[in-house]
């Protein structure tokens, strides 16, 4: 009887998979909104930090990035500020976009059962405060906020194990046909972009679909 009840409850759990790269301002916006939706609708978020450059190359997207297209970048900065104002959060561009080290840190936070907190802290530092993701002191700042052993965290993000896990998750994302960030999945349904979150909200509000 207890087993049946547990299986029934498991089927009611709604899980949204969230693929992101800390270099992405649109992922920062999406993370903020997705966290609010998770509170409102009671679903769980499964986080995946991936290498956006590798994902784009995998589908043949080898053109210049938005950062290299000055006219487009000028517009995107305006658009991003509009979204930030809508969400009532700050948005400050960092000095660079070298996100690999902090991306790998997600897989340390998983062992600490603090993935959501880690993602929020790093996004707020990089895009809320404009701190460069490769700033030498950023791991110490994150460790302090989360109550972690700084040395253990720094050792992990410099380890081969962290790189292997990061590469594995990026490859798995490519296999799942992820081509950009932010990308969200509810079951087999995929949405790409911060501006598609209203569609995800409609889906979450209408069906008890688990993410397995």
From Swiss-Prot:
Q: In which pathway does it act?
A: Aromatic compound metabolism; naphthalene degradation
Keywords assigned by UniProt, alphabetized: Aromatic hydrocarbons catabolism, Isomerase, Plasmid
The GO terms describing molecular function are: 2-hydroxychromene-2-carboxylate isomerase activity; glutathione peroxidase activity; glutathione transferase activity
In terms of superkingdom, the source organism counts as: Bacteria
**Which residues are noted in the entry as substrate-binding?**
56, 66-67, 97
Q: Which sites are catalytic?
A: 24 (nucleophile)
Q: What EC number(s) is this enzyme filed under?
A: 5.99.1.4
Cofactors that this protein relies on: glutathione
Isomerase: present as a keyword of the record? Answer: yes
Protein name according to UniProt: 2-hydroxychromene-2-carboxylate isomerase
Species assigned in the record: Pseudomonas sp. (strain C18)
């Amino acid at each position: 009887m207890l087993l049946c009840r547990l299986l029934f409850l498991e089927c009611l759990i709604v899980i949204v998979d969230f693929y992101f790269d800390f270099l992405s301002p649109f992922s920062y916006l999406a993370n903020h909104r997705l966290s609010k939706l998770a509170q409102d609708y009671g679903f769980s978020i499964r986080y995946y930090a991936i290498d956006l450059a590798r994902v784009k190359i995998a589908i043949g997207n080898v053109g210049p990035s938005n950062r290299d297209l000055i006219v487009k970048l000028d517009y995107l900065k305006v658009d991003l500020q509009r979204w930030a104002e809508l969400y009532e959060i700050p948005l400050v561009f960092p000095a660079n976009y070298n996100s690999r080290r902090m991306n790998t840190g997600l897989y340390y936070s998983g062992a600490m059962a603090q993935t959501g907190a880690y993602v929020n802290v790093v996004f707020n530092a990089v895009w809320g405060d404009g701190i460069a993701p490769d700033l030498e002191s950023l791991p110490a700042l994150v460790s302090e906020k989360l109550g972690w052993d700084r040395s253990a965290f720094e050792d992990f993000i410099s380890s081969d194990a962290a790189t292997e896990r990061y590469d594995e998750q990026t490859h798995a994302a490519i296999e799942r046909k992820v081509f950009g960030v932010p990308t969200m999945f509810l079951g087999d349904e995929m949405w790409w972009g911060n501006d598609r979150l209203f569609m995800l909200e409609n889906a979450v509000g209408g069906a008890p679909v688990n993410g397995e």
